[in-house]
Regions:
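C-terminal accessory segments of proteins
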Residues: 1-189
Length: 189
Protein backbone atom coordinates (compact mmCIF):
# COMPACT_ATOMS: atom_id res chain seq x y z
CA UNK A 1 0.00 0.00 0.00
CA UNK A 2 1.39 3.44 -0.96
CA UNK A 3 -0.71 5.99 0.89
CA UNK A 4 2.02 7.65 3.00
CA UNK A 5 5.00 8.13 0.72
CA UNK A 6 8.25 9.50 2.12
CA UNK A 7 10.98 11.27 0.15
CA UNK A 8 13.08 8.10 -0.02
CA UNK A 9 10.13 5.95 -1.06
CA UNK A 10 9.33 8.41 -3.86
CA UNK A 11 12.74 7.68 -5.38
CA UNK A 12 12.06 3.96 -5.11
CA UNK A 13 8.62 4.51 -6.63
CA UNK A 14 10.11 6.33 -9.61
CA UNK A 15 12.37 3.36 -10.30
CA UNK A 16 9.48 0.93 -9.96
CA UNK A 17 7.00 2.75 -12.23
CA UNK A 18 7.93 0.51 -15.12
CA UNK A 19 6.63 -2.41 -13.07
CA UNK A 20 3.08 -1.01 -12.80
CA UNK A 21 0.42 -3.22 -14.31
CA UNK A 22 -0.93 -0.74 -16.89
CA UNK A 23 -0.59 -3.28 -19.68
CA UNK A 24 -2.88 -5.67 -17.79
CA UNK A 25 -5.58 -3.16 -16.88
CA UNK A 26 -8.37 -2.92 -19.44
CA UNK A 27 -9.77 0.31 -17.98
CA UNK A 28 -8.56 3.49 -16.32
CA UNK A 29 -7.44 3.13 -12.72
CA UNK A 30 -7.53 6.05 -10.27
CA UNK A 31 -5.81 6.06 -6.87
CA UNK A 32 -5.52 2.27 -6.43
CA UNK A 33 -4.46 0.78 -3.12
CA UNK A 34 -1.74 -1.11 -4.99
CA UNK A 35 -0.49 0.10 -8.38
CA UNK A 36 1.26 -3.22 -8.91
CA UNK A 37 -1.81 -5.44 -8.53
CA UNK A 38 -3.24 -7.17 -11.58
CA UNK A 39 -6.73 -6.65 -10.18
CA UNK A 40 -6.26 -3.05 -9.01
CA UNK A 41 -9.44 -1.05 -8.62
CA UNK A 42 -10.08 2.66 -8.54
CA UNK A 43 -10.82 4.42 -5.29
CA UNK A 44 -12.75 7.36 -6.71
CA UNK A 45 -14.17 8.38 -3.32
CA UNK A 46 -10.66 8.57 -1.85
CA UNK A 47 -9.38 10.55 -4.86
CA UNK A 48 -12.34 12.93 -4.59
CA UNK A 49 -11.63 13.38 -0.88
CA UNK A 50 -7.99 14.26 -1.63
CA UNK A 51 -9.06 16.76 -4.28
CA UNK A 52 -11.61 18.27 -1.90
CA UNK A 53 -8.95 18.80 0.76
CA UNK A 54 -6.77 20.63 -1.78
CA UNK A 55 -9.56 22.94 -2.95
CA UNK A 56 -9.15 25.77 -0.40
CA UNK A 57 -5.42 26.09 -1.15
CA UNK A 58 -5.94 25.74 -4.90
CA UNK A 59 -8.72 28.34 -4.89
CA UNK A 60 -6.59 30.80 -2.91
CA UNK A 61 -3.56 30.27 -5.15
CA UNK A 62 -5.63 30.66 -8.31
CA UNK A 63 -7.19 33.87 -6.99
CA UNK A 64 -3.73 35.30 -6.31
CA UNK A 65 -2.39 34.17 -9.69
CA UNK A 66 -5.20 35.98 -11.46
CA UNK A 67 -5.27 39.14 -9.32
CA UNK A 68 -1.67 39.80 -8.21
CA UNK A 69 0.65 40.54 -11.11
CA UNK A 70 3.69 38.32 -11.62
CA UNK A 71 5.64 38.13 -14.89
CA UNK A 72 4.81 35.11 -17.02
CA UNK A 73 8.12 33.34 -16.35
CA UNK A 74 7.32 33.36 -12.62
CA UNK A 75 3.66 32.45 -12.80
CA UNK A 76 4.06 29.66 -15.36
CA UNK A 77 6.37 27.24 -13.53
CA UNK A 78 8.13 26.28 -10.31
CA UNK A 79 11.67 27.01 -11.49
CA UNK A 80 11.51 30.79 -11.59
CA UNK A 81 10.79 31.80 -8.02
CA UNK A 82 7.25 33.12 -8.06
CA UNK A 83 6.13 34.17 -4.58
CA UNK A 84 2.40 33.42 -4.75
CA UNK A 85 2.35 30.08 -6.55
CA UNK A 86 2.30 29.08 -10.19
CA UNK A 87 0.28 27.23 -12.79
CA UNK A 88 2.60 24.21 -12.68
CA UNK A 89 1.85 23.64 -8.98
CA UNK A 90 -1.90 23.80 -9.63
CA UNK A 91 -1.48 21.41 -12.56
CA UNK A 92 0.72 18.88 -10.79
CA UNK A 93 -1.43 18.80 -7.66
CA UNK A 94 -4.41 17.36 -9.47
CA UNK A 95 -2.31 14.72 -11.24
CA UNK A 96 -0.85 13.71 -7.88
CA UNK A 97 -4.30 13.45 -6.29
CA UNK A 98 -4.94 10.37 -8.38
CA UNK A 99 -2.03 8.50 -6.82
CA UNK A 100 -0.62 5.44 -8.50
CA UNK A 101 -3.26 5.28 -11.20
CA UNK A 102 -2.99 6.45 -14.79
CA UNK A 103 -3.10 10.19 -13.96
CA UNK A 104 -0.12 9.87 -11.63
CA UNK A 105 2.33 8.62 -14.27
CA UNK A 106 3.30 10.94 -17.15
CA UNK A 107 3.72 8.20 -19.74
CA UNK A 108 0.12 6.96 -19.41
CA UNK A 109 -1.80 9.88 -17.90
CA UNK A 110 -3.43 10.84 -21.21
CA UNK A 111 -5.27 7.50 -21.21
CA UNK A 112 -7.49 8.77 -18.38
CA UNK A 113 -10.41 10.92 -19.58
CA UNK A 114 -9.90 13.11 -16.48
CA UNK A 115 -6.59 14.17 -18.07
CA UNK A 116 -8.44 15.90 -20.91
CA UNK A 117 -10.88 17.73 -18.61
CA UNK A 118 -7.99 18.77 -16.37
CA UNK A 119 -5.86 20.08 -19.24
CA UNK A 120 -8.80 21.89 -20.84
CA UNK A 121 -9.36 23.63 -17.51
CA UNK A 122 -5.66 24.52 -17.20
CA UNK A 123 -5.84 25.99 -20.73
CA UNK A 124 -8.87 28.04 -19.65
CA UNK A 125 -7.08 29.31 -16.53
CA UNK A 126 -4.07 30.21 -18.63
CA UNK A 127 -6.33 32.12 -21.07
CA UNK A 128 -7.77 34.09 -18.15
CA UNK A 129 -4.25 35.05 -17.09
CA UNK A 130 -3.38 36.08 -20.67
CA UNK A 131 -6.52 38.20 -20.88
CA UNK A 132 -5.72 39.88 -17.56
CA UNK A 133 -2.01 40.42 -18.28
CA UNK A 134 -1.57 40.58 -22.08
CA UNK A 135 1.85 42.27 -22.01
CA UNK A 136 3.83 39.56 -20.22
CA UNK A 137 5.00 36.44 -22.01
CA UNK A 138 7.75 33.84 -22.24
CA UNK A 139 11.26 35.28 -21.85
CA UNK A 140 14.60 33.67 -22.61
CA UNK A 141 15.75 31.58 -19.66
CA UNK A 142 18.20 28.80 -18.84
CA UNK A 143 16.39 25.50 -18.36
CA UNK A 144 16.76 24.12 -14.84
CA UNK A 145 16.03 20.57 -16.01
CA UNK A 146 16.64 18.79 -19.25
CA UNK A 147 14.07 16.95 -21.32
CA UNK A 148 14.26 14.53 -24.24
CA UNK A 149 14.68 17.51 -26.57
CA UNK A 150 16.23 20.28 -24.43
CA UNK A 151 19.55 20.06 -22.61
CA UNK A 152 19.73 21.19 -19.01
CA UNK A 153 21.01 24.75 -18.93
CA UNK A 154 19.99 25.47 -22.54
CA UNK A 155 18.57 28.92 -23.17
CA UNK A 156 14.96 28.59 -24.33
CA UNK A 157 12.61 31.42 -25.22
CA UNK A 158 9.45 32.38 -27.09
CA UNK A 159 10.79 31.17 -30.47
CA UNK A 160 12.10 27.82 -29.18
CA UNK A 161 10.43 24.73 -30.64
CA UNK A 162 7.89 23.00 -28.40
CA UNK A 163 8.83 19.44 -29.31
CA UNK A 164 7.17 17.14 -30.21
CA UNK A 165 4.26 19.34 -31.29
CA UNK A 166 4.28 19.78 -35.07
CA UNK A 167 2.21 22.62 -36.49
CA UNK A 168 2.20 21.37 -40.08
CA UNK A 169 3.13 18.47 -42.34
CA UNK A 170 6.53 20.04 -43.04
CA UNK A 171 7.62 19.22 -39.50
CA UNK A 172 7.72 22.78 -38.19
CA UNK A 173 7.25 22.85 -34.44
CA UNK A 174 4.88 25.05 -32.52
CA UNK A 175 6.62 27.70 -30.43
CA UNK A 176 5.37 29.81 -27.55
CA UNK A 177 5.04 32.68 -30.02
CA UNK A 178 3.04 30.74 -32.62
CA UNK A 179 0.75 29.25 -29.96
CA UNK A 180 0.29 32.43 -27.90
CA UNK A 181 -3.11 33.35 -29.35
CA UNK A 182 -5.35 30.58 -28.03
CA UNK A 183 -8.25 31.75 -30.21
CA UNK A 184 -6.29 30.58 -33.27
CA UNK A 185 -7.03 27.02 -32.11
CA UNK A 186 -10.78 27.67 -32.26
CA UNK A 187 -11.21 27.79 -28.48
CA UNK A 188 -13.79 29.95 -26.75
CA UNK A 189 -14.30 30.30 -23.03
Amino acid sequence: MYTNLTASSLLDLTVMQSEFEFKNWNHTIRFPVDGFALNATSRNDAANERIGKQQPNNRDMLYKLLTVYQPFNQVSNKANGGTIGNFETLHDGLHNSFGLGHMGIVEVSAFDPVFWFHHANMDRIFALYQYRYPDTWVEDAAQAKGTFSVARGAIEGPASPLAPFHMNALGDMWTSTTSRNWTSFGYTY
